Regions:
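N-terminal membrane-anchoring/stem segments of glycan-assembly enzymes
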Residues: 1-42, 189-190, 202
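Short, well-formed alpha-helical segments that are part of the catalytic scaffolds
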Residues: 26, 30-35, 57-70
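Cell-envelope/extracellular polymer assembly enzymes that use nucleotide-activated donors
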Residues: 46-49, 78
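Acidic donor-binding segment of Leloir-type glycosyltransferases
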Residues: 65-115
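Acidic donor-binding/catalytic loop of UDP-sugar-dependent glycosyltransferases
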Residues: 89, 146-163
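Short aromatic/hydrophobic "clamp" motif used to bind/position activated sugar donors
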Residues: 126, 143
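Catalytic donor/gating beta->alpha subdomain of glycosyltransferases that bind UDP-sugars
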Residues: 164-198, 225-228, 233-295, 376, ...
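Membrane-embedded multi-pass helical conduit in multi-pass membrane proteins
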Residues: 294-374
Length: 393
């Protein structure tokens, strides 16, 4: 009886996820829907400055800066690199990339200052960039916040600005397509995107009538005046999941938009499982608000949603097997659009229960790291709330 009840509950969960959560699993919110059909060209193109925080990004910075300076944007566009105390020549490589394109005049490099207490490193670098922009005689209408490990197709900025102006948006974000080269990436990356969309249904984010908010930190175009009106980045200074925090901050003031894209790609490789593990462990517990009760609830929810269906289908027998099998089948159906977006077979969906178990383990490890004062580890810093030190000893 208990087994049948658990299997039936898991089936109801998957029916809800497929039908009642913004149809997130279909991945319909794409960048090609950003600009409404028939939208005319802008009579005046707003001024834009890209702010790129970078800390020891020698492997990717040249490609990132090069792709930004190669944008076909008709208006005035400049790039500000905030070098967050890099020791690997990040700034020099950025200059070389700009020089190769004859665009040194459109690249400015700001040397970041020491990270103060209460701030995460990325947000402190972004804030320094914003302060520098505000001190200029001619300030931009939009700021494009870009990670240093992102590359852009030439038309991305034009699309972002046209969409923002046509729809009256104050934040437009595109989720960079992650790598799927290594075995670890092929098995874990699509699930990461799937889980993110489940937590933050893009259709709900894009609906001004809903409170759900989020963004993808690699590529975020923000109206400068709205950011100032919202209180600036200081309002979210300690947020590990800074993109979603910024999305929530801006949505309280004006509409926002988030979409999948293949025009913005991540340059950061995750060659093995340990690399992806570190990425998830860094911020998973922050997603739960550093709450032990939420952690317990999340673990139980993951077990019920992802492990109970195959467990009942394969091992329970009797009346529990059918609802378990149906729930597992719906799980595969829901995961298939994400797998296809990443060019993978729907058969990978059969392994989603095991992949979910791995991510659950990462989440528990994230909580354990936080309890030991090692939360939010990134680029030699421990940045989570309660971390025992900002810099690694």
């Amino acid at each position: 009886m208990i087994a049948t009840g658990l299997a039936a509950l898991a089936l109801l969960i998957w029916i809800y996820l497929l039908l009642g959560r913004g149809m997130f699993w279909l991945g319909c919110e794409r960048d090609d829907r950003l600009i409404p059909p028939g939208t005319p060209d802008l009579p005046h193109w707003p001024r834009v400055t890209a702010i790129v925080p970078a800390r020891n990004e020698a492997e990717s910075i040249a490609a990132c800066i090069g792709s930004l300076l190669a944008q076909d944007y008709p208006g005035e566009f400049r790039v500000l690199l905030v070098d967050d105390q890099s020791t690997d020549g990040t700034a020099d490589l950025a200059r070389e990339a700009a020089a190769r394109q004859g665009a040194l005049g459109r690249l400015e490099i700001l040397t970041g200052t020491t990270l103060p207490g209460g701030w995460t490193g990325k947000l402190w670098a972004m804030t320094q960039g914003c302060s520098h922009v505000e001190a200029q005689a001619e300030r931009p209408d939009f700021i494009l916040f870009s990670d240093a490990d992102i590359a852009y197709a030439p038309d991305v900025l034009t699309r972002l600005v046209r969409g923002a102006e046509a729809r009256g948006l104050s934040l437009v974000s595109m989720m960079a397509k992650l790598n799927r080269t290594s075995v670890a990436e092929r098995w874990l990356v699509p699930a990461f995107i799937f889980f993110f969309q489940k937590l933050y249904p893009f259709a709900w984010i894009n609906d001004p009538a809903r409170r759900t908010a989020g963004a993808a930190g690699g590529c975020m175009l923000v109206r400068r005046e709205v950011l100032l009106r919202a209180g600036g980045l200081a309002r979210i200074r300690d947020a590990l999941i800074d993109d979603c925090a910024l999305g929530a901050l801006i949505k309280r003031e004006a509409p926002i938009w988030l979409a999948l894209t293949e025009r913005v790609v991540s340059l950061r490789p995750y060659p093995d499982f340990a690399d992806l593990r570190r990425m998830v462990v860094r911020s998973a517990y922050a997603e739960l608000g550093y709450s032990p009760l939420r952690l317990v609830g999340a673990v139980l929810g993951m077990v019920l949603t992802y492990l109970v269906p195959p467990g009942m289908a394969l091992f329970a027998g009797g009346p529990a097997a059918l609802p378990g099998a149906l729930a597992w089948a719906l799980m595969v159906v829901a995961f298939t659009p994400t797998l296809r977006f990443y060019g993978l077979s729907p058969l990978h969906g059969l392994a989603l229960p095991l992949i979910a178990a791995v991510y659950t383990g990462f989440t528990v490890e994230s909580a354990w790291a936080h309890l030991r004062g090692r939360g939010g580890a990134w680029k030699g810093r421990y940045q989570a709330k309660g971390a025992e030190s900002t810099e690694r000893a």
